[in-house]
């Protein structure tokens, strides 16, 4: 598990104790392991990553991380987002030029997707920020505000993200392919610190989508396409569904 060039790469997994809907979620057991341990183990399978850390606001999560061999960094409990949390944690790793933010509630995240984001950032320092998207297969998701849509240009850079349908379809025959945004981000280290230094932007606050802060400030976001969806865990019921998938029971 190491990058093949001089640009060291860090994966940071934000893990917050105080989820409104699911307190203590990172330590919820799924098939005998904490949720955050599943995410960490998937990241350990990556071939392009030098270090994986868990950025947390709670000593209980840090202690659990140590018990299964993970590095944990305790951060300010009052960060407004996971990106702010990983930015604080990344300060402890000054030799890492690339930082990947892997959501702490996606136990089936694809190691290959993480590697692809890391490779792209290392190969082209002009790409300051990167994320991923997948084709929407269920038409109902196009109008679902909980499914964030993205449109991008011919170079693969995002034009806009929205909870509304993107694009608006005036003539539905044929219906154009729509893409859902996946909540994984990668940053050039220097841009990560620039991003969290900017105040929340107008569109970001309107849509409640922090990636719009980058677009409003004139920064392109590269979008990597994938067919591998990684369901998140927001409720105990979703955790039970993941356990059933993992155990076949």
How does the language model describe each region?
Residues 109-201:
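Conserved core of the sugar-phosphate nucleotidyltransferase
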Residues 49, 95-96, 124-127, 219:
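Short, high-confidence coil segments that cap the C-terminus of an alpha-helix
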Residues 2-4, 176-249:
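Conserved alpha/beta core of the MobA/IspD/sugar-nucleotide pyrophosphorylase nucleotidyltransferase superfamily
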Residues 3-55:
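N-terminal glycine-rich phosphate-binding loop and ensuing alpha1 helix
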């Amino acid at each position: 598990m190491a990058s093949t060039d001089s640009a060291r790469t860090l994966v940071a997994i934000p893990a917050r104790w105080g989820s409104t809907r699911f307190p203590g979620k990172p330590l919820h057991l799924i098939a005998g392991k904490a949720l955050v341990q599943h995410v960490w183990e998937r990241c350990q399978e990556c071939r392009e990553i030098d270090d994986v850390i868990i950025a947390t606001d709670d000593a209980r999560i840090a202690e659990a991380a140590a018990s299964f061999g993970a590095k944990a960094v305790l951060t300010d409990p009052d960060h407004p987002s996971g990106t702010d949390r990983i930015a604080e944690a990344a300060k402890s790793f000054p030799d890492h030029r690339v930082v990947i933010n892997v959501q702490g509630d996606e136990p089936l995240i694809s190691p290959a997707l993480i590697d692809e984001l890391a490779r792209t950032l290392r190969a082209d320092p002009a790409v300051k920020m990167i994320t991923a998207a997948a084709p929407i297969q269920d038409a109902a998701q196009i109008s679902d505000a909980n499914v964030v849509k993205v449109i991008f240009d011919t170079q693969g850079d995002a034009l806009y993200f929205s909870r509304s349908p993107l694009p608006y379809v005036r003539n539905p025959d044929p219906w154009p392919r729509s893409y859902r945004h996946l909540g994984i981000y990668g940053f050039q280290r220097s841009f990560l610190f620039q991003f969290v230094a900017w105040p929340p932007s107008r569109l970001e606050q309107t849509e409640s989508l922090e990636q719009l802060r980058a677009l409003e400030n004139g920064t392109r976001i590269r979008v990597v396409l994938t067919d591998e969806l990684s369901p998140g865990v927001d409720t105990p019921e979703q955790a039970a569904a993941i356990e059933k998938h993992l155990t076949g029971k």
